[in-house]
UniProtKB/Swiss-Prot annotation:
GO terms for molecular function: DNA binding; DNA-directed RNA polymerase activity; ribonucleoside binding; zinc ion binding. The gene is Polr1B. One of its GO terms (cellular component) is mitochondrion. Its EC number is 2.7.7.6. This is DNA-directed RNA polymerase I subunit RPA2. The lineage of its organism: Eukaryota, Metazoa, Ecdysozoa, Arthropoda, Hexapoda. Component of the RNA polymerase I (Pol I) complex consisting of at least 13 subunits.
Length: 1129
C-alpha cells in the first residue's frame, strides 16, 4: 500500500508534455482499480467460495411419493462458466464472447449456470445429475469474464479502454451496476430503541438487542431479544417474512441440556450484585415452568409441536424435536455452528440488554457508521441466485409429484432428468433482476427494499461514471421517512464517507460516496482467522470453558459474533497492541478490525469486538509505533487517537497519523480546485455539476452502441488542478474549456448569474458539443432484407443500394432513414426520420447474432451537432453556474492593452454572497499558468495563513509582468476609451453542462387534453402544455396582471359551459332533457329544467373550469352537495 502511494504524483504536470502520454500502461492504476474493487472482488468471491457455501447450506427437499418412497433432493454444487458462443452455432472465428460484442449486438453478457443435483430414495444415494439452468449475466473483469486477467494492452485489443476497471453488467446492450447499500453490521449484538417494537405484542417495550446474523453463504436473518415492560424478555426469529416470539429462556433450554440452576448461574455470572437483573432472570425461568415444560427434551417437543405447521421443510415422518432443531439451526444465530456458541451469545445479549435497560450503558444507533456495513453486488447476486436455485428444486419436486401419481410409479434417473429439464431455469430471473433492479423474493433476502437495487451506469462523462462505483445508498425506505436521523453525517463516518459528495434534494444524506482510500473488506484466509483464538489465549484471555468466578471488571471478547471469553482490564491495552502488531505484519488478517471499547460511565457497553468478515468499511492510517500502514474499521476508529497533521501529535498519546489530509474526501471532491477556500454548499454543487458536464465519455467511439452519448469536441486540460486529477488520468477523458474571463458588469445581459460569451470564440468552436444517438434496425422475418426501392429514383441521393444512408450524410425530419424489402407482403417500405433536429450519419454497422435463426440487424449512429446556444448552462468548478444569455460580438467587448478579448464576461455580483474564493484564486493561477506555460497545484490544504495562496499566485503574476492582484485596465469595446476601474481578468476552467435549451424548449397552441380534467396533457414529447406553477401564479398576482392569470389558467386551460340553477345553486341538478326526434331527424328538447326545484325559469349557462365541475361531481358521490351563490350583473 505504502509503495503504491509513493508512486502516485504529488504535484500535477502537463499531460501531453510527458513522453509516456501515448503509451498504453503496463498495468491498471491503483486508484482506478479501487473504483471497481468492491464490485469485482465480491463477485470473484462468489465464484470461488460463495457458490460452494450456498450449495452446502441449502435445505434438502424431502417428500413421500405415492409408492411410499422417501425422496430427498439437495444441490451439491453450483458453477458459472465464461461467456461462449453456443456449440450449435458454426462459422465463428473464436468461441469467446467479449463485452464489446454484447454491447454492439444489444444482448446480455452471460455465461452458463449449471448445478449438480444429488438425490436419494429411502436413504440410498443415487448418481448425481448435472443440469444447465440457463445463462446468467457476468460481471466485467471478474474471474468468469473473458477479460478477467487481461492487461491494458489486451483490453484495447478487444475494444475496451486500457483503464477499464470492470464492476458492471452488460444487460441487453446497456451497462448496469448493482448499488452498494448500507446494512446493519453483521453478527454484532446491538442495543437498539425502536418505537415500532411496542406494537409487537403485550408488554413489549421499544428496547431490544438486535443481531443481523449472516452465515458464510451470505444468508441473512434478524434475531432480536425484546425487553418486556414486566421485566422478562422474548426472542424473535423470522421465517418467510413471518415473525415469531418465544420466551428467551425457553430457547436457552432448547439449545443446551442444562438445569435451571445452571442457566441461572450463567445468566447472572458477573452481575450477582444487580438485584433487579437477578429477580428478572428468576421471573423468566418461572415463565418457562408455567408452560409445564421442565426438561430439555420437553422444551424441544413443545416448540416443535407449536411450530410444525410453519415449517414444511421438515418432513412429516420426522418427530417434533427435529422441527426445533431446524429452527435452532436455520433460524437462530445462523452464523454460529454449535448450540453452545448460540447459547453463550444469547446469554450475553440478555446481560447487555438488561444493563442498557437500567441506563447503565448507552443505547446504540444503527444510523451510525460504526454499526454499519455494505451490501456488496457479489453478495446480493449470490443470495438471489441461491434462492432461485432453491425455487428450481421445488419446481422439480412439483414436476415429479405430477408424474408420480399412481402407487406403482417409481423414481428413476430418466424421470428425474426429464423433470429437471421441465422445471425451467434461473437465467431469465437473474437477467430480469439486473435489467429492472427489482427482486421477486419469497424470503426478502434480509433486505428492506425489493426495487431500485440496480441502476444504469450512465456514462455522461468520466466523473459521472466513476461516481457510480463509489456510491453507497442508505436504502429507498429512508427516502419516505420524515425524520432526518438517517441523513445526518455523524462524526464516526470520518474517513469512510465523504462529507462533500452528496446530492441536494430528496437523496441528500442518503446517497453518499466512499472516501478516496476507503476499502471494503473481503473474506480473509480461513487459516489466519482460526489462529486468532489461540493468539488471544496465549496473550491472557480466559476462555468461556474456564468456569471460575468472573469479576465485573472484565472485558468480553468477541470474534465475528462468537463469544470467546474474557480479558482483565489491566491487560486489555497490551493485548490490543499485540493484535495490531499481528495485523500489520501478516500473522493475522490484514483487514481485521479490533474494536476495543473501554470502560466508561454511562458509555458504550465495553468489550473487545474483533471482526474479520467481509463487507466492512476499512481505511489505511499510519501506525506511529510500528512505522507501517494499518487498516482500521468504523468501530475501532472511535476509540483511537489519530492525528490529521504531524504538528498535532501528542507524545505517548497519539497512536496513528492520517496518510494525507485529503483522504477524507471522495474521488470527485478531490477534483475540486481548492475546496478549502469555498463555502461548503458550493463544493457540494460542484460534485453534482461535474457529473452533468459534457466531456469525453469514452475513447472507443467506433465500437460504441449507447443510446445517447454527450461529447465536447474541443476539451482542454485545466491549468489549475489538484494532483488527484493526474493520478486518476482524467486528461484521457477531458471535460471543460479554459476560458479567458473578465469579471465586469458590462451589459444588462449578465444579471442573475447569466454570462456573456464572445461570439468570435463561439465561431471558433468554443464549448462546441455533439450528441451521439444509436438506432437499432431489426428485420425479424427471414425473407426480408435491406435494399433501396428500385422504382423510386428520388431515394438515390439519400440512400445507398443497400437501403441504408451514406455515412456522413445529413438527415432532417421526414427524410428517408432506410428502406427494406418486406418479404411477407413482397413490397419495399421506406422508413422516415423521426428526429426533430438535423443530424449527421456518423457510422453504420451490420450486426451478427448468436441465434440459430439470425435476424438482420443494423446499428446506425447519428451525430447531432450542439454548438453553444443562448440558454445553455455553464458552470465553473467552484459551483458558479449560469446560463449563456447573449453571444456578444468581439468588437463590442472590452479588450486589454495587449489586445486580449475575454471569452466570458462574468458578473462580479456572483462572488460576494457565494464566497467562492477558490474561483478568484483560480482566475489568478490560471493566468499565471498561461503566462509561464505551467500547471499549478490546486490540492487543498497546501497553503496556510502564513503562506497564503493569493500571495503565492500574486507574485507569480508579478514575475510575468502583470498586476499582483490579477486586475487589468480594459478599454471599452464601444468607444475605445480606457475604463476607470481595475478589472479582474484571468483564465478559468469552465464546464459546459448537458442541460441545453434544445432539449428543454416547449411551445403549444392547441393540442390534446386530459380526458378526466379537460386540461392540457403534460409532457414535452407528447405536445403537452407549458408548465404554469405556483411561482408563476404568484408572479402574476404580485404584478397585478389579473387578466393574464385568467387567460392562462382558465381560457387557455379547461374552460367549459355548464347549466346552473339560480334558486338552489346546483350545477348537477339542471337537465337539458331530450324528448324526441323531429321530422328532419334532429332532436328537440324541452327548456332546461332543474330537477331539484322543478323550475325552468331560473336555469342559465355559466363558464367554469372543468376541473371544478369534476370536483363537484366527485363530492356528490360522497353525499356532499356544493351550492353556488350567484349575483346578477
Amino acid at each position: 500500500m505504502l509503495e503504491e502511494m509513493q508512486q502516485m504524483k504529488t504535484i500535477p504536470v502537463l499531460t501531453n508534455s510527458r513522453p509516456e502520454f501515448k503509451q498504453i500502461p503496463k498495468k491498471l492504476s491503483r486508484h482506478l482499480a479501487n473504483l471497481g474493487g468492491p464490485h469485482v472482488d465480491s463477485f470473484d468471491e462468489m465464484l470461488t467460495v460463495g457458490l460452494d457455501n450456498s450449495a452446502k447450506h441449502m435445505i434438502p427437499n424431502h417428500w413421500l411419493s405415492p409408492a411410499g418412497e422417501k425422496i430427498s433432493m439437495k444441490v451439491e454444487s453450483i458453477w458459472i462458466a465464461k461467456p461462449k458462443v453456443p456449440q450449435d452455432v458454426i462459422d465463428v472465428r473464436t468461441r469467446e464472447i467479449y463485452p464489446t460484442d454484447s454491447r454492439q449486438l444489444h444482448v446480455s453478457y452471460s455465461g452458463m449456470c449449471s448445478v449438480r443435483l444429488g438425490w436419494s430414495v429411502n436413504g440410498v444415494q443415487k448418481t448425481p445429475i448435472n443440469m444447465d439452468l440457463g445463462e446468467v449475466p457476468i460481471m466485467l473483469r471478474s474471474k468468469a469474464c473473458n477479460l478477467g486477467q487481461a492487461t491494458p494492452e489486451e483490453m484495447v485489443k478487444h475494444g475496451e479502454h486500457d483503464s477499464e476497471w470492470g464492476g458492471i453488467f452488460v444487460i441487453r446492450g446497456n451497462e448496469k451496476i448493482v448499488r452498494m447499500l448500507i446494512m446493519t453490521r453483521r453478527n454484532h449484538p446491538i442495543c437498539v430503541k425502536r418505537s415500532s417494537w411496542k406494537d409487537r405484542g403485550q408488554n413489549f417495550s421499544d428496547l431490544g438487542m438486535l443481531v443481523q446474523t449472516v452465515r458464510e453463504d451470505e444468508s441473512s436473518l434478524s434475531n432480536v431479544v425484546h425487553y418486556l415492560n414486566n421485566g422478562t424478555a422474548k426472542f424473535m426469529f423470522s421465517h418467510v417474512k413471518r415473525l415469531s416470539y418465544v420466551p428467551v429462556c425457553l430457547i436457552l433450554k432448547c439449545l443446551m441440556d442444562y438445569t435451571d440452576e445452571e442457566i441461572y448461574n450463567r445468566l447472572v455470572q458477573g452481575y450477582e450484585s444487580d438485584q433487579y437483573y437477578v429477580s428478572c432472570v428468576q421471573a423468566m425461568l418461572r415463565e418457562v415452568q408455567n408452560e409445564n415444560v421442565y426438561t430439555h427434551a420437553q422444551c424441544k417437543s413443545f416448540i416443535g409441536n407449536l411450530f410444525r405447521a410453519r415449517f414444511p421443510e421438515v418432513p412429516e415422518w420426522q418427530p417434533d424435536d427435529d422441527v426445533t432443531d431446524f429452527i435452532l439451526r436455520e433460524r437462530v444465530m445462523i452464523h454460529l455452528d454449535t448450540y453452545e456458541d448460540k447459547f453463550q451469545l444469547i446469554v450475553f445479549m440478555i446481560q447487555k440488554l438488561f444493563q442498557c435497560a437500567q441506563g447503565k450503558y448507552k443505547v446504540e444507533n444503527v444510523d451510525s457508521a460504526m454499526m454499519q456495513e455494505v451490501l456488496l453486488p457479489g453478495h446480493l447476486y449470490q443470495k438471489y441466485l441461491s434462492e432461485r436455485v432453491e425455487s428450481w428444486v421445488s419446481q422439480v419436486r412439483r414436476c415429479l409429484q405430477k408424474k408420480l401419481t399412481s402407487p406403482d410409479a417409481l423414481v428413476t434417473s430418466a424421470v428425474m432428468t426429464q423433470c429437471m429439464r421441465q422445471a425451467g431455469g434461473v437465467g431469465r430471473a437473474i437477467e430480469s433482476f439486473l435489467a429492472t433492479g427489482n427482486i421477486a423474493s419469497r424470503t426478502g433476502l434480509g433486505l428492506m427494499q425489493n426495487s431500485g437495487l440496480v441502476i444504469m451506469a450512465e456514462n455522461i462523462n468520466r466523473m459521472r461514471y466513476m461516481s457510480h462505483f463509489r456510491a453507497i445508498h442508505r436504502g429507498s425506505y429512508f427516502t419516505t421517512m420524515r425524520t432526518t436521523e438517517a441523513r445526518q453525517l455523524l462524526p464516526d463516518a470520518w474517513g469512510f464517507i465523504c462529507p462533500v459528495h452528496t446530492p441536494d434534494g430528496t437523496p441528500c444524506g442518503l446517497l453518499n460516496h466512499l472516501t478516496l482510500t476507503c476499502e471494503i473488506s473481503m473474506r480473509p484466509d480461513p487459516k489466519l482467522v482460526k489462529a486468532i483464538p489461540k493468539h488471544l489465549i496465549d496473550m491472557g484471555m480466559m476462555p468461556l470453558s474456564n468456569r471460575r468466578y468472573l469479576g465485573e471488571k472484565l472485558y468480553v471478547v468477541f470474534l465475528d459474533g462468537k463469544h470467546l471469553g474474557h480479558i482483565h482490564q489491566s491487560e486489555a491495552e497490551k493485548i490490543v497492541d499485540e493484535l495490531r502488531y499481528g495485523k500489520i505484519f501478516g500473522t493475522l488478517p490484514q483487514m481485521m478490525e479490533i474494536g476495543f471499547i473501554p470502560f466508561k460511565k454511562n458509555g458504550q457497553f465495553p468489550g473487545l469486538y474483533i471482526a474479520t468478515g467481509p463487507a466492512r468499511m476499512m481505511r489505511p492510517v499510519w501506525n506511529l509505533k510500528w512505522k507501517r500502514v494499518e487498516y482500521i474499521g468504523t468501530l475501532e476508529q472511535l476509540y483511537m487517537e489519530i492525528a490529521i497533521d504531524a504538528k498535532e501529535m501528542y507524545p505517548d498519546f497519539t497512536t496513528h497519523l492520517e496518510l494525507a489530509k485529503t483522504h477524507f474526501m471522495s474521488n470527485l471532491a478531490n477534483l475540486i480546485p481548492m475546496p478549502d477556500y469555498n463555502q461548503s454548499p458550493r463544493n457540494m454543487y460542484q460534485c453534482q455539476m461535474g457529473k452533468q458536464t459534457m466531456g469525453t465519455p469514452c475513447l472507443n467511439w467506433p465500437k460504441q452502441a449507447a443510446n445517447k452519448l454527450y461529447r465536447l469536441q474541443t476539451p482542454g486540460t485545466p491549468l489549475f488542478r489538484p494532483v488527484h486529477y493526474d493520478n486518476i488520468q482524467l486528461d484521457d477523458f477531458a471535460m471543460g474549456t479554459n476560458a479567458i474571463v473578465a469579471v465586469i458588469s458590462y451589459t444588462g445581459y449578465d444579471m442573475e448569474d447569466a454570462m456573456i460569451i464572445n461570439k468570435a470564440a463561439y465561431e471558433r468552436g468554443f464549448a462546441y458539443g455533439s450528441i451521439y444517438k444509436t438506432k437499432f434496425l431489426t428485420l425479424d422475418k427471414k425473407s426480408s432484407y435491406f435494399a433501396r426501392h428500385p422504382h423510386m429514383p428520388e431515394l438515390i441521393k439519400h440512400l445507398d443500394t443497400d437501403g441504408l444512408p451514406h455515412p456522413g450524410s445529413k438527415l432532417s425530419y421526414g427524410s428517408p432513414l432506410y428502406c427494406y424489402f418486406d418479404g411477407e407482403v413482397a413490397t419495399y417500405k421506406v422508413v422516415k426520420m423521426d428526429e426533430k433536429e438535423d443530424c449527421i450519419v456518423e457510422s453504420i454497422r451490420q450486426l451478427g447474432s448468436f441465434d440459430l435463426s439470425p435476424k438482420k440487424m443494423v446499428a446506425i449512429t447519428l451525430r447531432v451537432p450542439r454548438p453553444a446556444t443562448i440558454g445553455d448552462k455553464f458552470a465553473s468548478r467552484a459551483g458558479q453556474k449560469g446560463i449563456c444569455s447573449q453571444k456578444y460580438p468581439a468588437e463590442d467587448l472590452p479588450f486589454t492593452e495587449s489586445g486580449l478579448i475575454p471569452d466570458i464576461v462574468f458578473n462580479p455580483h456572483g462572488f460576494p454572497s457565494r464566497m467562492t474564493i477558490a474561483m478568484m484564486i483560480e482566475t489568478m493561477a490560471g493566468k499565471g499558468a498561461a503566462i509561464h506555460g505551467n500547471v499549478y497545484d490546486a490540492t487543498p490544504f497546501r497553503f496556510s495563513e502564513e503562506n497564503t495562496a493569493i500571495d503565492y499566485f500574486g507574485k507569480m503574476l508579478e514575475a510575468g509582468g502583470y498586476n499582483y492582484y490579477g486586475t487589468e485596465r480594459l478599454y471599452s469595446g464601444v468607444d475605445g476609451r480606457e475604463m476607470t476601474a481595475d478589472i479582474f481578468f484571468g483564465v478559468v476552467h469552465y464546464q459546459r453542462l448537458r442541460h441545453m435549451v434544445f432539449d428543454k424548449w416547449q411551445v403549444r397552441s392547441t393540442g390534446a387534453v386530459e380526458a378526466r380534467t379537460h386540461q392540457p396533457i403534460k409532457g414535452r414529447k407528447r405536445g403537452g402544455g407549458v408548465r404554469f406553477g405556483e411561482m408563476e401564479r404568484d408572479a402574476l398576482i404580485s404584478h397585478g396582471a389579473a387578466f393574464l392569470l385568467q387567460d392562462r389558467l382558465f381560457h387557455n386551460s379547461d374552460k367549459t359551459h355548464t347549466l346552473v340553477c339560480h334558486k338552489c345553486g346546483s350545477i348537477l341538478a339542471p337537465l337539458q332533457r331530450i324528448v324526441k326526434r323531429n321530422e328532419t331527424g334532429g332532436l328537440s328538447s324541452q327548456p332546461d329544467t332543474c330537477r331539484l326545484c322543478g323550475d325552468n325559469s331560473s336555469v342559465s349557462m355559466i363558464e367554469i373550469p372543468f376541473s371544478f365541475k369534476y370536483l363537484v361531481t366527485e363530492l356528490s358521490s360522497v353525499n356532499i352537495n356544493a351550492r353556488f351563490k350567484l349575483n346578477e350583473i
